[in-house]
Design a protein with these regions (language model features):
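N-terminal "arm"/small-domain region of PLP-dependent enzymes with the aminotransferase-like
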Residues: 2-72, 76-83, 367-370
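Short amphipathic alpha-helices in soluble, non-transmembrane regions
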Residues: 361-367, 405-410
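Conserved glycine-rich beta-strand-loop-beta hairpin in the small C-terminal domain of fold type I
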Residues: 310-324, 336-352
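Short, solvent-exposed loop/turn segments at secondary-structure junctions
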Residues: 38-42, 99-100, 136-138, 159, ...
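Conserved core of the PLP fold type I
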Residues: 63-209, 220-242, 408-426
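Conserved PLP-binding active-site segment of the aspartate aminotransferase-like
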Residues: 350-355, 372-412
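Conserved core segment of the aminotransferase class I/II
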Residues: 123, 236-317, 330, 418
C-alpha cells in the first residue's frame, strides 16, 4: 500500500476501484455485526453467575434485606464501594443498577430545587451551562440536553480536560453549574486524568457557589494491563480547599457483574449526603438491598473486585489487540489518514479519521452490516466539529467478529479517505 496523501488523482481512482470491489465482497456476505455500545459480552456476564447462589437475606447488623429501610444502602455495601472509590462508607449512597440514574436525579435536584449553596434552582438561572470534555460519554450529554442546559466543549488530552480552559470558564461565569468527567480510562479515549489535573479540579475557584463536578468512575477497576492505575480521590483532595460539597463521584458494577442487575453508588460530602437523602426519601424508601447483599457476598472487598476483573481482562485484551493490530496493519501504510488511542483500561478505542470523513465511514460500515456508534455521538448535540471521531466498542462481539469488523472498518476508512481526497482534487 502506498501513501494516499502522495497519490495522484489517477492513482487514487485506481485505489478506489480496488476498495469498492473489496467493499462489495463484504456487502455480499450479509454481515450483522454490532460494535455500537460498550456492553459486556455474554462470556463476561457468565463470570458472575455464582452471585445468585447466595440465599442469605440478613445483613451484618441484623437488618432483614427483604424489608423496607436503609435508604443509603446496607452498611457492608457502602463499605465495599467506599473501599473501591477510596472514601469512607458514611460518604457512600448505594442505589439501584444504574449510576446514570443517580446522575440524572442529581441534575434534576439542581434543576428543580438547587443545592444548599444555590442562590436559586438551576431552572431559574438565565442560560445555565455545563462544561463537557470532548470526546465524551453521549449519555452524559443527553441528560444536560434533556434539561435544556447549554453545553460547552472542552478539549481532552491524555492528561484530561484542558484545565486552563476549565478554570477560566468556571471561574468567570456563574451560570456554569457543573462539568461531566470520566477521570479513569475515559469514555471514549481511554485517557486517565493526571494527578495534577485532579488536584486542579479540587482546588479551582468557581464563580457559581453551587458548581458540581460529576465524576463518573465507570472504569475505576477496568484495567487492561498489569499496571493498576489509580487517580487521587477527588472527594478527599477537595477537603483541604473546602470544596468537598462540589464533588459527586459515581461508580457501579454494570461492567463488573451485570449491567441490567448490578448496583450503583454515589460518594459525596457529609453535607451533600444529608441533602441528597432528604430529596431521595420522597421518591423511594430503599433500593434493592437483596442485590446489594448478593454483590457483597460475591465480591467481598476491593481485592475480590480486582481478582474478578482480572478474569474480564483475560477475555477483553485479545479483542482490543485485534482492533489495534488490524488498524496498524491496514491503515498505517496508507499514510497519515487515521490514528487511534491505545487504552490501558476501560471499554473503548477512539478512532480518528481525516476531518470530514467520520460520518461517511459510519455510513459505509452500516451499509455493509456493521453498526458503530453514530459519528459525532461523543460530542454534545451529536455534532463533531471536525467530523473525524468514531468510538469503537470491542467488548460485546466474539473475537472472530471483532477481527472481521476491524477488517471491514479499515476498508471503509480507506474508501472514505480516497473519496474525500478525490473530491478535494476535483
Amino acid at each position: 500500500m502506498a501513501n494516499y496523501l502522495e497519490m495522484s488523482a489517477e492513482q487514487l481512482r485506481e485505489e478506489e476501484q480496488k476498495l469498492r470491489a473489496a467493499y462489495q465482497d463484504y456487502k455480499a456476505m450479509g454481515l450483522s455485526l454490532n460494535m455500537a455500545r460498550g456492553k459486556p459480552g455474554p462470556h463476561q456476564m457468565d463470570l458472575a453467575m455464582d452471585l445468585f447462589k447466595t440465599t442469605d437475606y440478613t445483613a451484618d447488623d441484623g437488618t432483614d434485606a427483604r424489608n423496607y429501610g436503609n435508604l443509603e444502602g446496607l452498611y457492608e455495601a457502602r463499605k465495599l464501594f467506599g473501599e473501591v472509590m477510596g472514601v469512607k462508607p458514611e460518604n457512600v449512597f448505594v442505589g439501584g443498577n444504574s449510576s446514570l440514574q443517580l446522575m440524572y436525579l442529581l441534575v434534576n435536584i439542581g434543576w428543580t430545587f438547587g443545592f444548599p449553596e444555590s442562590p436559586c434552582p438551576w431552572s431559574q438561572v438565565e442560560r445555565p451551562k455545563f462544561l463537557c470534555p470532548v470526546p465524551g460519554y453521549d449519555r452524559h450529554f443527553r441528560i444536560t440536553e434533556e434539561f435544556g442546559i447549554e453545553m460547552i466543549n472542552v478539549p481532552m488530552s491524555p492528561d484530561g480536560p484542558d484545565m486552563d480552559m476549565v478554570e477560566k470558564l468556571a471561574g468567570e461565569d456563574p451560570s456554569i453549574k457543573g462539568i461531566w468527567c470520566v477521570p479513569q480510562y475515559s469514555n471514549p479515549d481511554g485517557y486517565t486524568y493526571s494527578d495534577e489535573t485532579v488536584r486542579r479540579f479540587a482546588a479551582m475557584k468557581t464563580a457559581a457557589p453551587d458548581f458540581k463536578i460529576f465524576w463518573d468512575e465507570a472504569y475505576i477497576v477496568h484495567h487492561l494491563t498489569n499496571e493498576i492505575i489509580e487517580t487521587p480521590v477527588l472527594l478527599e483532595e477537595s477537603k483541604p480547599y473546602g470544596n468537598e460539597d462540589r464533588v459527586f463521584m459515581f461508580t457501579s458494577t454494570s461492567k463488573i457483574t451485570f449491567p441490567g442487575a448490578g448496583v450503583s453508588a454515589l460518594a459525596c460530602s457529609d453535607r451533600m449526603m444529608k441533602y441528597v437523602c432528604k430529596r431521595f426519601e420522597v421518591m423511594i424508601i430503599s433500593y434493592d438491598k437483596m442485590n446489594q447483599l448478593r454483590h457483597v457476598h460475591f465480591l467481598k472487598n476491593k481485592a475480590g473486585v480486582l481478582a474478578h476483573m482480572l478474569k474480564h481482562r483475560r477475555r477483553l485484551v485479545p479483542c482490543f489487540d485485534a482492533v489495534k493490530t488490524t488498524f496498524a496493519q491496514k491503515l498505517t501504510p496508507c499514510g497519515d489518514i487515521a490514528h487511534w488511542t491505545n487504552p490501558k483500561g476501560g471499554y473503548f478505542i477512539s478512532l480518528y479519521v481525516m476531518p470530514g470523513c467520520a460520518k461517511r465511514v459510519a455510513q459505509l460500515c452500516k451499509e455493509a452490516g456493521l453498526v458503530l456508534t453514530g459519528a459525532g455521538a461523543a460530542f454534545p448535540y451529536g455534532k463533531d466539529p471536525e467530523d473525524s471521531h468514531l468510538r469503537i466498542a470491542p467488548t460485546y462481539p466474539s473475537l472472530s467478529e471483532v477481527e472481521q469488523a476491524s477488517e471491514l472498518m479499515t476498508v471503509c476508512v480507506r474508501l472514505a479517505t480516497v473519496e474525500h481526497l478525490l473530491a478535494e482534487k476535483a
